[in-house]
Swiss-Prot record:
The keyword Lipid biosynthesis does not apply. Belongs to the peptidase S26 family. Its EC number is 3.4.21.89. It catalyses: Cleavage of hydrophobic, N-terminal signal or leader sequences from secreted and periplasmic proteins. The keyword Protease applies. SUPFAM superfamilies: LexA/Signal peptidase (SSF51306). GO terms for molecular function: serine-type endopeptidase activity. One of its GO terms (cellular component) is plasma membrane. It is a single-pass type II membrane protein. This is Signal peptidase I. It comes from the Bacteria. The chain crosses the membrane at residues 14-30. Keywords: Cell membrane, Hydrolase, Membrane, Protease, Transmembrane, Transmembrane helix.
């Protein structure tokens, strides 16, 4: 075999690898950088995330999933899913009620313990903040984990399901905070 054929033979696997990575990046996974404090303490500004774009083509959106969605033409936001289509949402005395039943939010406990009065979320009903009694079909209701400082569905309303980029699969930076579970 000539040296030229050997070189071509070594380039082929690299070409295939680059094509596979580019395809995965374009259609399956995306990198995101967290900007701001709205998802603290779960996610912090500067965290690097991998978002699975196919998650909701394969399975359903679940309450408490952390998602990335197109907020407008220029910005994507990362928030937590609180309300699914058909849900009635309310907060009273810092407790989440979905369809009239208390729902525990264990991911907020560490943050609540740091607060002076232990209260993270002000009282509201879905109707008070959106004018609707239920989350409409084809929409979700999202909140940031830092409820005191988050621009979320309480301010901009429902997120259409077709605005969702994907589900946050894991945080890979900083490496000491590497996590699959949120």
């Amino acid at each position: 075999m000539t040296k030229q054929k050997e070189k071509r033979g070594r380039r082929w696997p690299w070409f295939v690898a680059v094509c596979v990575v580019a395809t995965l990046r374009l259609f399956v996974f995306s990198n995101y950088v967290v900007e701001g404090k709205s998802m603290m303490p779960t996610l912090e500004s500067g965290n690097l995330l991998i978002v699975n774009k196919l998650s909701y083509d394969i399975g359903p959106i679940r309450r408490f999933d952390i998602i990335v969605f197109h907020a407008n033409k220029k910005e994507d936001y990362v928030k937590r899913v609180i309300g699914l289509p058909g849900d009635r949402i309310a907060y009273k005395n810092d407790i989440l009620y979905v369809n009239g039943k208390k729902v525990d939010e264990p991911y907020l406990r560490p943050y609540k313990q740091k607060l002076l009065d232990g209260r993270l979320t002000g009282d509201f009903t879905l109707e008070e903040v959106t004018g609707k009694t239920r989350v409409p079909p084809g929409c979700i209701f999202v909140l940031g984990d830092n409820r005191l400082s988050s621009w979320d569905s309480r301010h901009f309303g429902f997120v259409k399901i077709n605005q969702i980029v994907g589900k946050v699969d894991f945080r890979y930076w900083p490496f000491k905070q590497f996590a699959f579970q949120f």
